[in-house]
Design a protein with these regions (language model features):
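Active-site region of chymotrypsin-like
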Residues: 19-25, 52-121
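C-terminal cap/linker of serine protease catalytic domains
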Residues: 96-162, 166
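Residue-level recognition of tetratricopeptide repeat
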Residues: 186-190, 223, 230, 268, ...
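Start-of-helix register in tetratricopeptide repeats
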Residues: 179, 216, 259-261, 293-295
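Structural motif corresponding to the intra-repeat A-B loop/turn of tetratricopeptide repeats
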Residues: 157, 191-194, 228, 240, ...
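Short coil turns that delineate tetratricopeptide repeat
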Residues: 175, 212, 256-258, 291
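Conserved active-site neighborhood of the chymotrypsin/trypsin-like protease fold
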Residues: 1-40, 48-51, 67
C-alpha cells in the first residue's frame, strides 16, 4: 500500500493505492449497478486453500447516496469472505462483501463498488478521525485547489518532517504550482542551518520560474526575505538574504505590476532600513491606490514624523 485515498468507518471501506507490476490484471468495476434477482458470484481470496466461489441472487437494493447502493444477497458468507468482490455474469465487480453480524444468517450484505470508488481525500481530510486512525499516510486530494487547502490545514497538525514529506508529495503531484515551492522553502528555512537555507534558495528560484504572475512571484520572494531578516534581530544573515535583496525583489515586482500591495511591502522594507523619505514615498503610493486604508495613512504620517 502506497497511501490511503479515502475511508468510511460506517461501511468499513478503505480505498488505497498500491504498487503493481504491469503483469497484474485488475478487476474492473461494473458499468451498471446490480439488479434484483440478478445472479452474482463471490470471488474468494486466492490465499484460501479451498478457493471455491459462492453464488446467489440479489434480493434487495438500497440507495445510500448518489449512484451508490447497498445490496442484500440470498447467500451465506463467512468471515473469510469479508471484503471479497461480488461479481456479475460479465466478470465485473458489483460490490464488496460486508461482515455479517449473524453467522448463521442465509443472507449477506455488500456495499456497492460505486460507493467505494467515490471515496476520496478532501481539503478537510487532514482532520478526519477515521483516516488518521488507520496509520497509513494519506494521499493528496486530486483537485489542485483542494490539495492546497489540505496543505494549509495539515501545516499545524504535522511535525516538521511529516509536513516536509507532504510538501514533497505536493510538488511531485503539482510541479507547476509555485505555492508548493514557497511553502517548502519556508519549511526549509525553519531548520535554521546553511544546508537547508541552500535548499530554500533553490526552491525560491523555482517558485519564481514556475509562477506565470512574475509580480506575485517576486512579491512573495521579497516578503519571505523581509520576514526572515526581521526574525534575525541583528544576527548575521545567510548569504545575500538581506533587506537590500528583499528591496531588489520587490522593485522587480513593481516593474511587472505597480500594485498597492507591492508598494506597501516596499515601504515596510525602506522603513526597516531607516530610509524614511523613500518609505514615505512608498506609503504615499499606497494611499493613492485602492489599497488605501487607515493603517496605510498612519504609516505615512508616522514616517513623515521621522523625516522631520
Amino acid at each position: 500500500v502506497e497511501y490511503i485515498l479515502g475511508a468510511n468507518d460506517m461501511y468499513d471501506v478503505v480505498k488505497f493505492k498500491t504498487a503493481a507490476d504491469k503483469k497484474t490484471v485488475a478487476l474492473q468495476p461494473a458499468s451498471r449497478p446490480g439488479a434484483v434477482s440478478e445472479t452474482v458470484y463471490v470471488l474468494p481470496y486466492s490465499t484460501q486453500k479451498a478457493a471455491s466461489g459462492t453464488h446467489g441472487t440479489i434480493s434487495k437494493i438500497d440507495t445510500i447516496s448518489n449512484n451508490s447502493f447497498y445490496y442484500t444477497l440470498n447467500m451465506k458468507t463467512g468471515e473469510k469472505t469479508v471484503s471479497c468482490p461480488v461479481m456479475n455474469a460479465e466478470g465485473e465487480v458489483v460490490a464488496l462483501i460486508q461482515k455479517n453480524s449473524d453467522k448463521e444468517s442465509t443472507s449477506s450484505y455488500a456495499i456497492g463498488i460505486g460507493y467505494a470508488k467515490s471515496l476520496s481525500i478532501s481539503a478537510l481530510s487532514a482532520n478526519d478521525y477515521t483516516l488518521n486512525t488507520i496509520g497509513i499516510k494519506k494521499g493528496l486530494p486530486e483537485d489542485e485547489s483542494q490539495a492546497l487547502v489540505y496543505l494549509y490545514v495539515s501545516s499545524s497538525n504535522l511535525s516538521k518532517e511529516e509536513y516536509l514529506n507532504l510538501l514533497n508529495e505536493f510538488i511531485q503531484q503539482y510541479p507547476k504550482n509555485s505555492e508548493g515551492y514557497s511553502r517548502r522553502a519556508l519549511c526549509y528555512m525553519g531548520y535554521g542551518d546553511d544546508a537547508h537555507y541552500a535548499l530554500a534558495e533553490k526552491d525560491l528560484q523555482t517558485m519564481v520560474e514556475v509562477n506565470e504572475n512574475k509580480g506575485d512571484a517576486y512579491y512573495n520572494l521579497s516578503k519571505l526575505l523581509y520576514n526572515y531578516v526581521l526574525g534575525l534581530q541583528g544576527a548575521k544573515p545567510y548569504g545575500d538574504w538581506t533587506m537590500e535583496r528583499a528591496l531588489k525583489e520587490i522593485n522587480t515586482a513593481l516593474e511587472n505590476d505597480k500594485q498597492g500591495l507591492y508598494y506597501q511591502l516596499q515601504g515596510d522594507i525602506y522603513f526597516a532600513m531607516q530610509k524614511y523619505p523613500e518609505a514615505f514615498a512608498s506609503y504615499d503610493a499606497v494611499n493613492r491606490s485602492p489599497l488605501a486604508s487607515a493603517a496605510s495613512f498612519y504609516a505615512a504620517a508616522k514616517t513623515k514624523e521621522l523625516i522631520e
